[in-house]
Amino acid sequence: MASALNSKIHPPGTCASSKADARGGSGWRMDCDPEMHVKMCKKIAQLTKVIYALNTRQDEVEVSVESIREAHQEDLQDTGAETRTRLPQEQSRTSEDAETLLKRIQTLENALELQKRLTQEALAESASCKLETKERELRVEAEHAERVLILSKEMLELKADYEKRLQLLTSHEGPQWGQLSQESPDATAESSQRPEMHQVLLEVERLRAENKQLSQDYARKAEELQATYERENEAIRQAMQQSVSEALWQWQEKESGLRKNFQVQESALQAQVRKLEGDLEHRGRKISDLKKYAQKLKERIQDLDVQLREARQENSELKSTARKLGEKLAIAKDRLMLQECHVTQKTDDMKTEDGVLGKRDDLEACSLHPQQEQGFPKLCHCRNGGSETQTKKEASGEMENMKQQYEEDLRKVRHQTEEEKQQLREQLGKRLEDLVKKHTMEMKSVCSTVEVERKKLKEVEAQLEEVKTKSEREIQQLQEEKAALSTKLQNSLLEDPCSRPKKPARDEGLEKLTDEEESSSDEEERTGESVKGKSDLQPPFESVMKEKAVEIGHRPEDWQSQRTKLQTQAAECLNKDSTDSLQAHLLELQALEDNARQELQEDCEQMQVQQSGLLESLRQELTEQRVACCEHQKALEMLQNEFRAVGPLGKWQATNQCPGDRRDHTFITEDMGVTGPPGSLPCAAEKGLLEENAQLQDTVLRLRAEVDQHLQEALQLREQHRLLEEDQKAQRAMEVEALRQEHRKEMQAMVADFSGAQARLQARLAALETELKESGEKAGKGTSRPEDLQLIGRLQTRLKEREDIIRQLTEERRFHYAAFPSAVSHRNRSFSFNPHPGYLTPSMKKKKMEEVPSRVVSVPNLASYAKNFLSGDLSSRINAPPITKSPSLDPSPSCSQPYKPTQLLDGKTASRTQDGEPAQPKEAPQKQGSPHQEWFTKYFSF
């Protein structure tokens, strides 16, 4: 301004040094201020670019972390869905396999029972056949021995009689023939006795004929007896052969049928075993595949955890770098503020120096040209007065415009803050309502689950009571049956002395029964303990209720961590339960299959041993029967030989008696005299034989009756033993069926508990998934997350702090201008972001340090950040109080007053008005603001 005034007042060529000095000072000021501001703004822009790049990188990292989380959650959901889909399938398969195995076991047991029954029947029939054959052999041997004894006795008697008769005859014939030879010379004398001799000879002949007839009758009777004996023996032999052949045929048929049945059963069992082995291999493969898949999932989860940790570390590093950069930015801003203060001080010093130089120039001009100054005082005064009025009008217009803009900005800011507050309140209300609804739904679901589980526990207790009552009844029945069996066993032991060696087996059966009863009682105790364990599930439900209450009291920030933990726990529990259940089922199936295989092998071995024993016994019986038949044949041949030997002896006796007719006369006479009539001897022998035969038949009948009685008693004892064994088997089968039913019930209860726990976990997972989906949908729709709420709270606090800062700044500005009116700087504030360029208090520094954002969210937030600074700058310009006039600014023609910067402004305005440019002062701030806007759009439009 001073240079312009001097150029107007002084003619060219006068006071060049003063003009050059003035131009140099003003040029240095104009060159220094924009460059410094541009440099500082460029530095700020670079720092903002770096911050924006860091923020974008952090956003990208957060997006990647969220994508990884979503992928992890999707993987967990997929794995959970797969496990859910596979678990019921595998459970159904295991249940079906268990049912099929149980059916197969039942069929096998039925087949084994049938085989055992058939074997028992076969053994009973074989034993009965053995007994019958032995009895028949004994009968035949006894009859044969009796007949042999009878015949031998008869032969001995006949021999004794014959020898006696021979002795008598020999003893009587010797003296008779001697007497006859002595009396032969006297034959003539005894001629009178010839008719008597003739009679005697006739009687001898008659006796010989009778003897011949008797011998013939005896031979005929012996032949008849031998024929009858041979016939009976042949009939017995044929009957024995027929019975043996029939028994052999039957046994062969039974053996072939049993072999066929055993072969069919063995083939079926082998096929079943192969099928079971294939099923086991297939299941083992499935289990190995599932284990591999679970291992892969675990590895993938570990990789995702590692990626999450790395992302978190990167995020923390980025946050630390952002904080460091924010601190550096704050330090740079402080440095820039200090530099601005230093520059303002330098500019003030330069202004004062320019004023001093202008005063010197004026004084020199006044001293050199006093006459010229006397001619132009009125014109200068008029021009100075016009320029002051114009500047005042322009300043007042600018102040009004600034006030209007500031008021409009304040209205907009207030309107925006009110709208944001209303939106936040609505969002908070909606979120609270949603949370209340969720908590109520969770409480209702928990209560419903607790009620359902209580009902289930009551049902289980009722079932257990029924099972206990049934078990008690069964125990009572078993005890009664045990007592009855013990009494029967005692009676049978007392009745049958032959069954004494069978006591240990029965004692072992009783011990087995007691062991089975003890095992059933132990299983009942186990079921009771399992029921107690189920009844003890109520405290965990109460703990779950408490945990729910605690979770309801937690802050909303902990929900995500709890959800993730619950998901991981649920997945782990499902995996553990599935693996444990599969392992338990596999172990049980393996145990059942091993038991079935062992039982089948043992039964097959027993049947083979029994069959081999039966075959050996049959072979021995056949050999014994053959030996007995051979012995009988030999005995018959011996008897035939004896009879044949007896036949020629009789004939020889007859021939020996024929030539001795004379001797017979004396023999018969003496015999008649001694023994009586000759016809009495064969009659007595026949009577004795008949009596002996009758006695022998009576003894045989008695023996047969006794044998029949013994057989009946043995059959009764066998039937009693068989009934006892059947009763024991039935009791054992009942006990086994009861144990199987209890095992099935326990398995069903375990499956029901597992399915219930799985359903609960699935419901809980579904609830958590729905909550996560709702939270994700709300986040996608624009609902406020906890992070958003925190950001909103921070923004609200910052807005409040900025409003407080603006108020304090306006008050301090007013106070400052009221106290120091001469400290106002007339520099261009278009590039400055500081409302107080040369005034910093400790409170202001603290507030500015607090105002430094820890994280710039996005580009719109940067724009709002810059707008807030611009609005602060504008507010500082608008709220600046009007400059009070000092007496130095009053127009006066005196040159002794100090020169002020306002005079320079007046000179500039006067020069512009003199050149005929009245609209330039109003357009000056616009021209100064336009480069600032261009620079701002250039550096902040990324």
From Swiss-Prot:
Biased composition (Acidic residues): 514-526
Coiled coil: 89-150, 196-337, 387-495, 575-619, 686-815
Pfam families: FAM184 (PF15665)
Highest taxon in the source lineage: Eukaryota
Biased composition (Basic and acidic residues): 504-513
Keyword set includes Translocase: no
Compositional bias (Polar residues): 885-900
Region named Disordered: 1-26, 73-97, 486-542, 880-934
Keywords: Coiled coil
Family indicated by similarity: Belongs to the FAM184 family.
Name listed for the protein in its UniProt record: Protein FAM184B
